[in-house]
Amino acid sequence: MRTLTFILIGAFLLAAPIVQAQDNSTDILIQVLLRKGILSESEASEIRQEVTAVAEAQKAEIVDAAVAQVERVYVSSPSVPMPSKLSNLTLTGNARFRYHYENAESRSGENNDRSRWRYRIRLGSIYQFKESAYSLGVQLETATSNDSNNANFGGFFDKSGGGMSVGRIYLNYKGEDWNITFGKQASPFYMPKMLWDGDLNIEGLSESISRGAWTFTAGQYIIDEENESKERIGGQSVTDDALLMAQAKWTNGEGLVFAPVLMATTGGNSNFSESGTFSGANSVQYFHDFAVAGLPFEYGFKTGNGQKHKLFGAWGMNLKGDELVNDPDSPFFGGSTGQSSKNQFANLGYQMGSAKKAGEHQWSAEYRFMEAGAYTPNLSDSDWAKGQLNQGGYVINYKQVFTDFFNLSVTYLVGDSIDDDYMASPGNKGNTQVLLIDGVVSF
């Protein structure tokens, strides 16, 4: 900026004396010619106007030349380049502001109303190694819960909820038609939100391979790390617990998708001796009797006016659901043995529109049904029914994308108990209602 100032000042200083000298010489000459009677007053006035016009043009030429010189200097000046080692780095992030209302009635009808203003921040980066199929991903997130990145406003301006935690850290290898990821990562599986909370980041190894219309995905994930040296006779198990998953996804390329999935845990009642406990909506530190088979699906299509539509859903069951609710040592135990038919889940929904670009909007309506022994609250959508099982109800959503960086959505979730006689804590609530109003800024 200092160089620009000096050049422009110099241009005006250079132009000023030239124009001034021309003006003085012209006036003296015109006065002499007038006194000798060679020029009339009208002729002298015309000559002055012509000389002034020429002088202004010369001054403009000098200034234009100076400006052109400045532009050449600044265009040719090299910009500060990104270090070569960071040239393959992609940065992402978003901030969400939320109004959150919830009420989960007890079976006696007692209300538990709560409303909060909340925020969430995610800052991510992916580094693609040069001339390599490997990439490294890192994401920082607010809060520490496994199924929520939300922090609350209202701590008298404190900063206790605004700390950043490592949400993802993973190494990925991407081949021509196969993919391997190790670390703390987003789920690679095609799952409805009812079965998989969007804030969960799994920890372990994921593999996928594509063959024509099929994509096969498998995963082996650590859910509890234990120190085997602490095992005591008659004490709790100190064996590491794992979640195993496998899925075969098929699509016809025209909007139809079927994706059968199998899920199972290897452990039982964990004590988290090394990793500490985890917090989540209605979380249960119990991983026994979980062997789930499910069939997520969707069908997307367009009508004659180009409007996008989608039907989606899932059906499945926990093959060990009856054992789960009949085991007196299980937190899912319903109070008496011999219980049955509590092991199924399902959802069915419809969406119109696709809110991905500025000016687009969508709305959707969905029915959900999840019995007491059908699944685990450790993985399911933490917003619906406050993570409760033994619930059936609806989810209605509207989303509008206003700009490339801002969207607004409103979601209403309502449910009620399926079996009023079931009183175990994972599914002992009555009517549940949740209202979410989200404003998201992406950058």
What residue spans do the PLM features occupy?
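Hydrophobic alpha-helical segments of integral membrane proteins
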Residues: 14-15, 19-20, 171
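Short, structured loop/turn "capping" segments at alpha-beta junctions
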Residues: 49, 255-258, 304-311
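Outer-membrane beta-barrel pore domains
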Residues: 102-112, 155-161, 273-443
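A conserved mid-domain beta-alpha-beta active-site/ligand-binding segment of alpha/beta enzyme cores
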Residues: 234-236, 240, 259-291
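Bacterial N-terminal signal peptides
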Residues: 6-15
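N-terminal periplasmic/intermembrane-space "pro-region" immediately following the signal or transit peptide
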Residues: 6, 19-108, 443
